[in-house]
Amino acid sequence: MRTLCSLLLICCLLFSYTTPAVGDLKHLILKAQLARCYKFGGFCYNSMCPPHTKFIGNCHPDHLHCCINMKELEGST
């Protein structure tokens, strides 16, 4: 019985642990999304984009919106 409990504990610890590589990958994705937003002249906004702007993507997985001013969008075309 003691062996079974020990084995169960080890399995729980192994499957619940997030590796540092996963954290690093998430950080790189966040950085890439933020850089892409700024590259196109956008800015990050916490809620829906204001009326004079357009939604062009996400800044982070935390549901921040990447918005761009309509004047900048018209000037680039």
Swiss-Prot record:
Q: List the disulfide bonds.
A: 37-66, 44-59, 49-67
Domain of life according to the entry:
Eukaryota
Q: What keywords is this UniProt entry annotated with?
A: Antibiotic, Antimicrobial, Defensin, Disulfide bond, Secreted, Signal
Where does the entry say this protein is expressed, by tissue? Expressed in both adult and neonate brain, and very weakly in kidneys, epididymis, and testis.
SUPFAM superfamilies in the cross-refs: Defensin-like
List where in the cell it is found.
Answer: Secreted
According to its UniProt entry, one GO biological process term is: defense response to bacterium
Which family is it part of? Belongs to the beta-defensin family.
Protein name as it appears in the record: Beta-defensin 11
Specify the species: Mus musculus
